[in-house]
């Protein structure tokens, strides 16, 4: 269950795995690290200060341990990197029983490298991970979404939309051991020389196990 940008299990492109998210990007711009553990609604860190700099990283890590606590981590940086060579936005959420959701969305107007990853692992129910990258004119676009849950209802979604990018990769990886694992990955490139979309799903042991994956890409 590994694909183009090495998102397998519960770790994705920029090494946000489990409940700790470490994204050490060298450069002279902004780093916004928000980490919370064992709380009802942990951290939502948003960074809008990615001007034209060499590197910019926004890490939001949320971990909750006990039952009936919904740890959600949401990180949105929209349109904030003008001409940045490296811009990363990662969101990681881990909860051991119920309702761990992680969402990461990256919108870059003109960045040469833009990656958005959402990693989510939950031990029991209702684990959903969504990652979306939209670039207007970027040479490299990576969007990876990785979700692993031990029991029920694991769904991952990864989407990349490129207007004029030379490389566009979208990968979605999901593994669940019991029921209802669905992955969907789509990559649309209007004028890109390389466009890759891969989706892999594996489920192991259950009385009724459903696994569906759909992948579509188009380049002009």
UniProtKB/Swiss-Prot annotation:
Keywords in alphabetical order, please: Secreted, Silk protein
Q: Name one GO cellular component term.
A: extracellular region
The reply to whether Zinc figures as a keyword in the UniProt entry is no
Expression across tissues is: Produced exclusively in the middle (MSG) section of silk glands.
| Annotated region described as Disordered, given as residue ranges | 1-220
**Could you tell me where the Low complexity compositional bias lies?**
1-131, 141-155, 166-220
Q: What sections of the protein cross the membrane?
A: none
* Primary location recorded for the protein, binned into one broad class: secreted
Ranges annotated as biased composition (Polar residues): 156-165
Localization terms from the record: Secreted
Functional description taken from the UniProt entry:
Provides the silk fibroin thread with a sticky coating. Acts as a cement by sticking silk threads together.
The protein's name in its UniProt record: Sericin-2
Q: What is the lineage of its organism?
A: Eukaryota, Metazoa, Ecdysozoa, Arthropoda, Hexapoda
């Amino acid at each position: 269950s590994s694909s183009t940008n090495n998102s397998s299990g519960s770790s994705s492109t920029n090494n946000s795995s489990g409940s700790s998210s470490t994204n050490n990007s060298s450069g002279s711009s902004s780093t916004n690290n928000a980490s919370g553990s064992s709380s009802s609604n942990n951290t939502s860190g948003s960074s809008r200060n990615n001007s034209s700099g060499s590197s910019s990283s926004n890490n939001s890590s949320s971990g909750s341990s006990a039952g009936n606590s919904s740890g959600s981590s949401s990180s949105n940086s929209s349109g904030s990197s003008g001409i940045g060579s490296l811009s990363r936005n990662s969101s990681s959420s881990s909860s051991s029983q119920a309702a761990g959701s992680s969402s990461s969305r990256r919108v870059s107007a003109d960045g040469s490298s833009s990656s958005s990853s959402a990693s989510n692992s939950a031990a029991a129910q209702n684990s959903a991970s969504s990652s979306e990258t939209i670039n207007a004119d970027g040479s490299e676009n990576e969007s990876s979404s990785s979700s692993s849950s031990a029991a029920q209802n694991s769904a991952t979604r990864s989407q990349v939309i490129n207007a004029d990018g030379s490389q566009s990769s979208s990968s979605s990886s999901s593994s669940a051991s019991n029921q209802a694992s669905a992955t969907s990955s789509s990559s649309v490139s209007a004028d890109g020389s390389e466009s890759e979309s891969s989706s892999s799903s594996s489920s192991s042991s259950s009385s009724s196990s459903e696994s569906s994956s759909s992948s579509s890409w188009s380049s002009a």
